[in-house]
């Protein structure tokens, strides 16, 4: 397989937060970039363009427990405070810009709570059925360690960030590298049906979401707790990029016990 440098991969992220309304978050970022926010109906989002013309969205997410500060006390808030920041497609050289956006919304009043998660997308355009097979096998072998290191909540693991399905992994691992195709891989991932056209297909709720490969063209890691610490945001993204890069060069690992 071809070798890819970590910094040659495109990425994006979704960071869930509360403490700030979607409108106020867009206003703060627009002020930073010198642009005006605008509203779109999709997910009741407020959007703003950066100096490169890329769109940053602040969308509603029903999984977020909405809160805000009142006289220094955290209180319940209405749905306006359900705020998910959706970055545009970024190059590694734009990591600093992302970190400035994170700092900006934090300084404007945003914070995270236990209901908030962070997702990282990595461009899948160079991935192959063999590299995706590597992805599932590596995740299966290392998930317990990864979840412990990232302090993944049991609730998140049970609902939105499940571990690899052993039966699906075994079926894919039995496919010879010489004959495996993306179509065969896709059928195995969806357990016989093609769910790639369904936005909320049930297979998206895994720590490594390969539904995103077939629906969006990205590998998605959903195993991160949300953070507005710019350094931790960078670390989470770099980890996902490093794993993605490893998939191109690793021989298919053995399916060992966790």
Where are these regions (language model features)?
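Terminal catalytic/cofactor-binding subdomain
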Residues: 1-108
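Helical (often loop-to-helix) elements that flank the catalytic cores of nucleotide-handling enzymes
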Residues: 31, 94-101, 125-150, 228-244
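A common structural junction motif
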Residues: 32-37, 105-112, 142-144, 242-247
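Aromatic/basic-lined ligand-recognition segments
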Residues: 57-59, 68, 133-223
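Short glycine/proline-enriched loop/turn "hinge" motifs that connect secondary-structure elements
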Residues: 73-78, 109-114, 210-215
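Histidine-centered divalent-metal-coordination microenvironment in nucleic-acid enzymes
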Residues: 111-127, 218-222
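Beta-strand-rich recognition/accessory modules
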Residues: 202-205, 215-247
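Single conserved hydrophobic/aromatic residue that forms the stacking wall/gate
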Residues: 248-258
């Amino acid at each position: 397989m071809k070798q890819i440098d970590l910094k040659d991969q495109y990425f994006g992220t979704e960071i869930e937060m509360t403490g700030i309304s979607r409108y106020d978050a867009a206003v703060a970022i627009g002020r930073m970039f010198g642009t005006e926010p605008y509203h779109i109906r999709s997910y009741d989002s407020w959007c703003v363009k950066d100096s490169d013309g890329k769109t940053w969205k602040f969308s509603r997410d029903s999984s977020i427990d909405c809160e805000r500060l009142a006289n220094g006390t955290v209180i319940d808030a209405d749905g306006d405070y359900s705020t998910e920041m959706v970055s545009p497609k970024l190059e590694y050289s734009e990591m600093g810009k992302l970190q400035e956006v994170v700092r900006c919304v934090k300084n404007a009043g945003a914070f995270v709570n236990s209901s908030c998660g962070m997702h990282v997308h990595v461009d899948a355009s160079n991935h192959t059925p063999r590299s995706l097979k590597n992805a599932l096998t590596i995740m299966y072998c290392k998930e317990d360690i990864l979840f412990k290191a990232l302090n993944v909540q049991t609730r998140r693991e049970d609902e939105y960030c499940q571990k690899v399905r052993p039966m699906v992994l075994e079926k894919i691992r039995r496919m010879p590298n010489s004959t495996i195709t993306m179509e065969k891989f896709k059928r195995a991932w969806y357990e016989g049906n093609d769910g790639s056209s369904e936005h909320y297909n049930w297979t998206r709720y895994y720590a490594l979401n390969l539904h995103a490969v077939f629906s969006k063209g990205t590998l998605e890691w959903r195993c991160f707790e949300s953070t507005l610490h710019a350094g931790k945001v960078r670390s989470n993204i770099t980890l996902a990029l490093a794993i993605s890069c490893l998939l191109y060069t690793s021989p298919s690992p053995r399916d060992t016990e966790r």
